[in-house]
Regions:
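Collagenous Gly-X-Y triple-helix signature in extracellular proteins
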Residues: 1-189
Length: 189
């Protein structure tokens, strides 16, 4: 989010939170949003050491400023990857990342019908999830995935869950696991 209402990820408080505090495993990170103060401790959940930080590379988080929620998942994905991107160490999911978590059973649904597939996603969504996708036509809003699975535009000063995303360097190897919630990947860094 951004206190001034901007929907530009690279200028947002979330960008600072993820790429400064979370990435560096800071013990205390504070910011203010709409006259409300927040303090976070990332010493146990952020990247704990340089070895871990060196396993992460700069990545391009693709997004689209599409406004047509009548498109299906593949159309959004193609538009996101043909459009602009932000470059950073840690980013947010884009709308198509979330929709791909439903598997192939929902791929032909339109973005505005994803609430029909919420139970099929492996991503937990209890309060709504921020995406990196800006939406320009409605006054600098940002797309979020609501807790019922709908993708819609909201003001960037609202509060929702953050799912940090990152790109690993090519030398990082999967040594165990299948990527499921019951058997997550174990990495050799």
């Amino acid at each position: 989010n951004h206190e001034d209402g901007s929907n530009n990820f690279s200028n947002s408080d979330i960008y600072k939170l993820l790429n400064e505090a979370y990435y560096n495993g800071l013990g205390s990170f504070s910011y203010e949003n709409l006259n409300k103060s927040y303090t976070f401790d990332f010493s146990n959940v952020g990247f704990k050491n340089n070895k871990t930080r060196l396993a992460i590379r700069d990545g391009n988080w693709h997004y689209s400023q599409l406004t047509d929620i009548n498109l299906n998942v593949d159309a959004w994905f193609n538009n996101e990857y043909a459009d602009a991107y932000y470059n950073s160490k840690v980013g947010l999911i884009n709308a198509s990342d979330y929709t791909y978590s439903f598997g192939s059973t929902c791929r032909n649904l339109k973005i505005n019908k994803f609430y029909n597939c919420t139970s099929k996603s492996w991503m937990k969504n209890t309060e709504g999830i921020w995406t990196i996708n800006p939406q320009e036509e409605m006054g600098n809003t940002v797309y979020r995935i609501s807790n019922d699975g709908a993708v819609n535009a909201v003001w960037p000063t609202n509060e929702y869950e953050i799912y940090p995303t990152l790109y690993l360097n090519s030398n990082v190897k999967i040594i165990a696991g299948d990527g499921s919630s019951s058997n997550p990947y174990q990495l050799d860094i």
